[in-house]
Curated annotation (Swiss-Prot):
Chief subcellular location: membrane
Gene: atpG
Subcellular location: Cell inner membrane
Function of the protein: Produces ATP from ADP in the presence of a proton gradient across the membrane. The gamma chain is believed to be important in regulating ATPase activity and the flow of protons through the CF(0) complex.
NCBIfam families associated with the record: ATPsyn_F1gamma, PRK14110.1
Protein name in UniProt: ATP synthase gamma chain
One record GO biological process: proton motive force-driven plasma membrane ATP synthesis
InterPro entries xrefs: ATP_synth_F1_ATPase_gsu (IPR035968), ATP_synth_F1_gsu (IPR000131)
């Protein structure tokens, strides 16, 4: 590598400073978006609690086992719902999610796999592989989560399970584990089981009695549809928050690295300038001595 002049080094430092300003700005923006995403999760919690409570009561008081969404079948066709990001610059956010999905795919080599993808990154990754992509949604997280997309995907998944086009549906997304960590998660989406709801709502009052007015099947279909849509919506909320956290951390690390590089190149610059000054002094002294 050729030796850089002080001017070249100074230019390099200026470039790193510009990059640092960009990464720091992206960190600040991601932090603001993270707070907003966390607020959305918090606001959805009361609705979530009541919905799980209602589903738990349905299990306790209504014969749900004859409903097609509760029936288990031999696993011949498996659908995966993969919720990724539309953008990069978020550390291992997408990479770790894909590793978890790929690990699951290796565990079911004899099943026909169908993919439902949310996010550009998952679409780019899996469109290059031999899996069948049934549906793909992009720009879901541009501002607020587009609930029309949630309902469309939810209806499609429910229909596929009812029509026995798939025998099992698994949902993959990133979730915040604590305020400072996130991880990819895998959960069964369909069929629904008592354990799915009971884990969320353990303190069930079995004395509560529901009077069903109207067609029980229609009412059950409506409630289950709302419940399944909420599962998707909650997964997208969690993924959105985890993405902003991952990007905030990645940009913070990039800013710190840039700061370290500036310090390193500043030392190199000072050394190069000192060497240049020393060389000039030697030339002056040598020239003066030659004139004597």
């Amino acid at each position: 590598m050729p030796k850089l002049s002080p001017r070249d080094i100074k230019s390099k430092i200026a470039g790193i400073k510009n990059t640092m300003r960009i990464t720091n700005a992206m960190k600040v923006v991601s932090a603001a978006k993270l707070r907003k995403a966390q607020e959305a999760i918090f606001k959805a919690r009361p609705y979530s609690d009541k919905l799980y409570e209602l589903m738990a009561h349905l299990f306790a008081h209504i014969d749900t086992y004859s409903h097609p969404l509760f029936k288990r079948r031999e696993l011949k066709n498996v659908d995966l719902v993969i919720i990724s990001a539309d953008r990069g610059l978020a550390g291992a956010f997408n990479t770790n999610l894909f590793k978890k999905v790929d690990s699951y795919l290796k565990s079911c080599p004899s099943q026909r796999i169908n993919l439902h993808i949310v996010g550009k990154k998952a679409n780019q990754y899996y469109s290059k592989r031999s899996y069948h992509i049934v549906s793909s949604y992009q720009d879901v997280f541009k501002k607020e989560i587009n609930f029309d997309i949630v309902k469309e995907l939810g209806a499609k998944l429910i229909s596929r399970y009812k029509e026995e086009e798939t025998d099992h549906i698994v949902l993959f997304n990133n979730e915040m584990i604590t305020k400072a960590t996130y991880a990819p998660k895998e959960r069964r989406f369909l069929p629904i089981t008592y354990e799915d709801v009971h884990i969320q709502e353990p303190k069930l009052d079995h004395n509560t009695i529901y009077n069903i007015e109207g067609n029980e099947t229609d009412i059950l279909d409506g409630i289950i549809s709302i419940y399944m849509n909420y599962q998707l919506y909650r997964a997208m909320l969690e993924s959105n928050a985890a993405e902003h956290f991952a990007r905030m951390v990645a940009m913070d690390n990039a800013t710190r690295n840039a700061s370290d590089l500036i310090k390193k190149w500043t030392l190199i610059f000072n050394k190069a300038r000192q060497e240049s000054i020393t060389a000039e002094l030697i030339d002056i002294v040598t020239a003066a001595e030659a004139m004597d």
